[in-house]
């Protein structure tokens, strides 16, 4: 009786699988009517596996049957079934830092003294080229003016078709300032005295030419007194 019931269950499952396959074929034929209809091949009778089943209630794939394997009795199949093994305690030797090789690479307790590769009496260099030191006095003043040159002096008709290196377009050029060409700027009291003296020398010339301004003529002594009062204030 039990064998007959199992056979009936197998038949119903096979009929359900065949119906699903026929429905899929019909849907494909409806989508492509021009193609020839291909009937599914009959299933080969194989040994029935009890733990191979189908899920018929799957909303993700619109209730299509999804095959799955029901793992029954993993305790009996422990030889091939995956299981976690307990970690084994591995004994490690004690770490000894008293050997010669390990003590060389340890951090020393006292501060290290680096060797001096230069004389301490030598002054430090400044700038890219060590030509000047920090203790230079103001005797050697900077008598050069740096500017950008826009002089080409380029002629394509000449055989050396290159401009002068020192006067290329956009290069930095230094021009020496000559001491004789520099204008001497007078101080403030000298400027006032020079202006007052020049005004006093021009006024008597105007009186000689016939200008009737005798009341407004001032002497140079009064001008000097006024300039001294201005400076004192």
From Swiss-Prot:
- What keyword terms does UniProt attach to this protein? Cell projection
What's the name of its gene? Cimip6
Q: What is this protein called?
A: Ciliary microtubule inner protein 6
Q: Name one Pfam family in it.
A: CMIP6
Taxonomic lineage: Eukaryota, Metazoa, Chordata, Craniata, Vertebrata
- Renumbered to this chain, region (Disordered) spans 1-45, 192-233
Protein origin, superkingdom: Eukaryota
Q: Which organism is it from?
A: Mus musculus
Composition skew (Basic and acidic residues), residue ranges: 1-14, 21-33
Q: Segment Mn: which positions?
A: 127-159
Q: Where in the cell is it found?
A: Cell projection, Cilium
Q: What is its main location?
A: other
Record-linked InterPro entries: CMIP6
Q: Which residues form the signal peptide?
A: none
């Amino acid at each position: 009786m039990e064998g007959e019931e199992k056979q009936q269950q197998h038949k119903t499952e096979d009929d359900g699988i065949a119906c699903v396959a026929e429905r899929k074929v019909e849907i494909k034929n409806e989508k492509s009517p021009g193609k020839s209809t291909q009937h599914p091949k009959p299933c080969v009778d194989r040994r029935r596996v009890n733990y191979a089943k189908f899920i018929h209630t799957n909303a993700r794939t619109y209730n299509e049957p999804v095959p799955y394997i029901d793992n029954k009795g993993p305790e009996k199949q422990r030889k091939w079934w995956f299981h976690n093994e307990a970690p084994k305690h591995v004994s490690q030797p004690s770490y000894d830092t008293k050997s010669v090789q390990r003590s060389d690479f340890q951090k020393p307790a006292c501060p290290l003294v680096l060797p001096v590769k230069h004389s301490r009496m030598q002054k430090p260099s400044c700038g890219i080229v060590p030509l000047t030191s920090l203790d230079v006095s103001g005797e050697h003043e900077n008598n050069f003016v740096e500017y950008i040159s826009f002089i080409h002096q380029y002629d394509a008709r000449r055989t050396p078709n290159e401009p002068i290196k020192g006067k290329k377009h956009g290069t930095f050029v230094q021009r020496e300032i000559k001491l004789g060409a520099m204008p001497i700027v007078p101080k403030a009291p000298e400027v006032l005295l020079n202006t007052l003296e020049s005004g006093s020398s021009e006024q008597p010339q105007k009186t000689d030419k016939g200008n009737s301004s005798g009341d407004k003529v001032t002497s140079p002594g009064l001008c000097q007194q006024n300039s001294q009062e201005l400076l004192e204030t």
